[in-house]
Amino acid sequence: MNQKIIKLCKKIKLVITDVDGVLTDGGMYYSDKGEIMKKFNTKDGMGVELLLKNNIKTVLMTKENSIIVKKRGKKMNVAATYVNIKNKEQELEKICKIFDVKKNEIAYIGDDLNDYNIITLVGFSVTPANGINQLKEIANFISKINGGDGVFREVADMILFAKNIKTNL
C-alpha cells in the first residue's frame, strides 16, 4: 500500500458501502418461485466484524428496496442499513450528523454511476475491479477484486493495516 493510501485510511472512522456490485456480484438470481436471491461473500462479513471490534462502523447503502439487504445488514451487525436511497449525497450529510463524523473520515465503496457523486465527497473512495470506468477514473483505490468476491474485506484490512491494528479476533 502506498503512503498516500495509508494516510487516507488512517483517518477512517466509518465505512459506507453500496451493496449490489460490491457486497454481491451484481447478478440477479431468481428461484423457481420467482423469489429474488443475492449471493454475499462471508469474507466481507468478517471485515465488518474486524472493523467493529476496532470501533469503525459500517453502513450499507443501496438504491434498491430489499428485504434481503436488510437481513444481511442485521446478520453482519452493521451500524445502519439504508435502502431505497435515490440521492446518496443527501444521505451522506445525514450520516455525518448521526455518526458524528466528517466526510474525510468516511470510506465509500461503490461500483456504478449512482455512486459517482458520493465517491467525490468522502475521504477514501474505492471501486471494485469490475466497477465502471468512470469510477476507476476518480476513486482513490481500484481493487483487483471483483464485487461479491471480498472487496469489502480488502478495504477493511487496508484500513486496519494503516492504523497498525492486528487483524485477529
Give residue spans per PLM region.
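Substrate-recognition element of Asp-dependent hydrolases with the DxDx(T/V) motif
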Residues: 48-72
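Amphipathic coiled-coil/heptad-repeat helices and related helical stalk/stem segments
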Residues: 1, 43-44, 88
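Non-catalytic pre-domain segments flanking phosphatase-related domains
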Residues: 1-17, 165-169
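A positional/architectural concept
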Residues: 23-52
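Asp-based phosphoryl-transfer active-site loop
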Residues: 10-28, 119, 152
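Structural motif
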Residues: 61-63, 84, 108-109
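Short coil/turn segments at beta-strand junctions that form active-site/ligand-binding loops
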Residues: 11-13, 56, 104-105
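Mg2+-dependent phosphoryl-transfer enzymes with acidic/Ser/Thr/Gly-rich catalytic loops
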Residues: 38, 74-75, 81, 89-169
